Each structure stands twice: as C-alpha cells, then as structure tokens.
Amino acid sequence: MSQLHARDYEPNRSGTLDGVRILDLSRLFAGNVLTQILGDFGADVIKVEPPEGDTLRAWKTEGIETHWKVYSRNKKSLCLSLRDPRAIDIIRKLVPSTQIFIESFRPGVLEKMGLSPDALLALNPSLVIIRISGWGQDGPYAQRPGFGTVIEGVSGFAAINGFADREPVLPPMYLADGVAGIYGASAAMIALREVEMKGGRGQIVDLPLLDPLFAILSPQAANYRLTGKVKPRTGSRSTNSAPRNAYRCSDGHYVSLSGSIQKMAERLFRAIGRPELVDDPRFRTNSDRLRHADELDAIIGEFIGARTQDQNVAFFEQAEVTIGPIYDTPQIMADPHVITRELIADYPDPDMGQLPMHHVVPRLSQTPGAIRTPAPALGQHNRELLNEIGIGDDGYAALREANVICEAPNKAAPAKRQSSL
C-alpha cells in the first residue's frame, strides 16, 4: 500500500500566471517540461496536438501514458491537423489572445506553414515566440535532426560521463530536453517581463537543446585552454576534490560521500578511526588526495563495505560527514522526507487509480503553484476553444467531418477519489 499522501486536483486554485495564455505547438519533452512548469503556476496552456496526439503520449509503460500524465497536467488539448489551411486559420485566430507561442519544428517549417514570427507578431505585437530546436535557428547544423541523444554527445556531456576504460555514457533519460525546458521557462518569464516593462515589445526566443546543456557542464573550454588537457571520465569521482565517490555497502546498496573541503576530509578520517591519515603525506591536502584517490577509496570503501546502507548513513550523519543513500525509486517513494514534504503525492487517475506525481517546483511562500487538473484527453478542449473564436456546433461538425479537428473517441473522466469513511 502506498505511503504517499493522497491529494486531489484543485481546479479552482488561482496562480501568479493567471491570464497568461500559452499556445504550445511543440512536441516531446522540452516543450512539455517548459509548459508544465508555467502551467503549475496558473498559465492557461493550450497544447496543440496532431491527430495521432503529441509524441509524448507514445512513451507508455504497461500501455499507460505515464509521461503524458505527469508532464501535461494543468493543460488543455486542442487537436488540429496543421496540414490543413483551416487549422492554420484557427491558430491565427487564437494568437491575439496569446502571450507565449511555443514550437519545436525544424527551422523554417513554421514559416512554410504561414506562421512565421513576422506573421505572428503582426497579429500580436506583444507575443513571446519560443522556438525549440536541436541546434538553433541558424548555423551550419540548423537543419540537422536535433534529438537529445545527439545533443548529449555533441555538448561534451557523454565524453565526461562514465569510466576512463569504458565508452562514453549517455544519460539514461532526456537530460538535454529537460535542461532546455527549464531554461525555456526562465526565458519565457524574462521575455514576458520585457513586454510588461518596456511598452509591449514581443520577441523571439531561440532555444536550442545544445546551448543550455553545454552551459551547465562546468567551465570546460576555459579549463582546456589553461591546461591543454581534456577532462577525463572518472566514474563517480571528481576531478576537483577527493574523497568523492559512490561506495558499496554490505547489503548491496550504495552511499554517496563527499569530503570536498579540508575540514570535512579530516572529520571523515577521525570518524572512521584513522586520525593518522590527517597528516599522512598521501592525504594531507586535497591535491595529495586526488593523486592517491585509489588508496583513499580503498580505505573508505573497506569501512563502508562492512556496514549496511542505513548503518552508514546513521554513523556518518552522527559524525557530521557529508553522506547520503543512493536510492532507487521504491526507496524514494518510502523516504519519510519525501513523504512529509510531498515531493511525490498520489493523485486520482482513471487508469492507475492513483498516479504518483512530483510536487510543483519551485515552492513559493506567497504564491505557490498547484496541480489543478489532470492531463487532458486528446482534443478534450476543442469545443471550448473553438467556441471562443466564434466556431459553433455547425462549424465544429463540419471541421470534424473534414478531419481538420480531431478528438479521442472516448474521453474518460478523471477518477473520483474514494471516501475513506
């Protein structure tokens, strides 16, 4: 039985971004992360989906759209066949009431659709246009496919990830997309602030996957210029400080430990009953410890390997040494800190009964976000949005018949929470 707190959706909650409408034509992960963040704080996110649905829907587990459910909460779904000029006309009619427009087509495709930035800004001069791509809107690689896997290689991430005697390691998740989505949410707010402060000037945000990921990977270029050396793959070790590693415990679990400052390293040596290591020439300074990392890890690993994960965490926390358990998902979901702060909570779901989802991030004291609505069914909000631009029942039926608009055949209602009484 789940230990997570049971929460319900809060459809009547307001947010800081109430009144900010986002028209999101992007696909897959980066755009969905971006709009999930802003939607959590009240933005009116209209997810424009093709007849087959956003490609994120295809990432299923046991036949269930878990990615879509988590990252498309607080959104509306408008399903349009954008190959039809009538669908493009619908987009144009929605643009004047929109503050942020997002797309992730290959550079030039939006222009071919008749929705160039100039055309959009003519309809709404205050519009913020976010263009997500792999490589950016210009440059030699602009027309290359821009999947995150490729970007994670070119950015330098894979080259520094893994072990020296093994192949470079790509991340086991969509890191480039996720980082771009977070940067994109920041960019959207910066550009929107410009609109508010300087008299309504909209602008274009060029958001490739490559630039944000490279930006967080340490000062690689500066370090290379200074040393002429490429940062090696060091597994869980650091090239900046030692000790720092993942250590195996007696129960097969692992802990992560860092003695990155001198006082912490000395405290660690005393805690494991080896005070003489403080003055050992191999370990006296951080530079010494880096040169003798194998010997240092062997000493620490022997101590940790004789104890379980829980024993190690309790021991080193008592000694005020920086350590933490390396969790798998079941451990995360059972952790008292995670449960108490509701980092994850259970929400009602028609397919799973209860859907564990991450909390709104970040947490604001005066204007916290909220999970107001579950992820929508395909085309769930077609009628509402088309009615807004003057398309009534007859017009809707004609567009539906012509396959300009589409909807899920059976849109399930959100699950009702069962009473505990």
Residue locations for each model-derived region?
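N-terminal helix-loop segment corresponding to the beta1-alpha1 unit
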Residues: 1-198, 233, 377, 383-421
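Glycine-rich beta-alpha junction loops
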Residues: 52, 135-136, 209-214, 251-253, ...
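Short Gly/Pro-enriched turn/cap motifs at secondary-structure boundaries
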Residues: 68, 234-239, 245-246, 352-355, ...
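A short glycine-threonine-serine/GTX helix/turn-capping micro-motif
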Residues: 169-179, 200-204, 233-238, 242-244, ...
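Oxidoreductase and adenylate-handling cofactor-binding alpha/beta cores
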Residues: 181-202, 215-227, 269-275
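Beta-strand segments within the central parallel beta-sheet cores of soluble alpha/beta enzyme folds
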Residues: 201-210, 315, 397-400
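Aromatic-enriched alpha-helical interface/lid elements that frame and gate functional surfaces
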Residues: 243-319, 323
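A glycine-rich dinucleotide-binding beta-alpha-beta segment and adjacent secondary-structure elements
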Residues: 318-372
